[in-house]
Amino acid sequence: MSDDAARLPAGTDLLRTVRMTLRLNAPPERVSRAWADPEELARWFPDRVEGGLAVGARTVLVWESQRVWWDVIESRIGELFVFRWPWLPDERLVTTVRITFAAAGYGTLLELEDGPFPLDRPGGIDAWAEAIEGWSEELARLRAYVDFSVDLRERQ
């Protein structure tokens, strides 16, 4: 048993999923393109996108300090975007991110799920906590970009 799992109360479900909801003032087609179009994605999330974001494609997201791959599993503009990616540098933990887009009034209701994060595996608890913090920040950046055309990423 890992040190992380040893600290959990008996009977604890050892899988966690990050779930977040965000309302945006743009239509679902616009919001989903911010995820599914490499040029749009690079305006708010990574510094650069290498490759396309087609279903079945492996794409690499590039930041100054890291490179992370995405495998796009499913994409329907205005409805759904699903991909897999690693949370740990050695790729011991790979999660599936499912993002849905639904019309809500004059805008979009975005629902994001990322997981599962196995709390009983080394690095699982830390990756889950990092995902909660990271997705909170990234969804704030998405809102700034889609609703206000503002890039909140830190620049050197």
Q: Where does each model-flagged region fall?
A:
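Glycine-rich portal/gate segments that line the openings of hydrophobic small-molecule binding cavities
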Residues: 45-89
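Hydrophobic/aromatic beta-strand elements that line small-molecule binding cavities or substrate pockets
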Residues: 22, 70-74, 95-103
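Intrinsic-disorder/low-complexity, polar/charged segments enriched in Ser/Thr/Lys/Arg/Asp/Glu/Gln
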Residues: 15-21, 58, 67, 80, ...
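Hydrophobic pocket/interface hotspot
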Residues: 31, 41, 59, 72, ...
